[in-house]
Amino acid sequence: MKKKTILIVVGIILLVPNLPVINKYVAHRTDEGYFRYANLDGSFIATQRFSFKSPGFSTVGFEEFIKNTSPAKENRKLYRLYKINPLCFWRWNNYLQIGVHFDYMDPKVIEQNMLAKGLDIKGIRQDIDSL
């Protein structure tokens, strides 16, 4: 009986923060600005927003960027700038729906590429320091 109760409580603790509306609220309060994406040279950077007026994350903006700027082949891939931490169970919903579709790239590599290209690194520098 105790095992069953413990399993139910643990299941609820893991499941509830990943329910759609609750997950968006938890992510807005704890992870706003954490989920960042960029191409290799840093000419495109996107941050996933979680306010209730924000739409879900989409690559449409990146596709438009590619269509309008025609970057080099290596800069046509979007990378996530955050590591997937399985202990952060409240992020599992985001990890499984979005994060697993993008390869990880260290933000410092993006920063170096931005410096080499002469781009402003102020925004990404703040993100690297906060990681």
Model-assigned labels for residue ranges:
Residues K3-R80:
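N-terminal export/targeting and maturation segments
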Residues A46-L131:
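Extracytosolic and intramembrane catalytic regions of membrane-associated proteins
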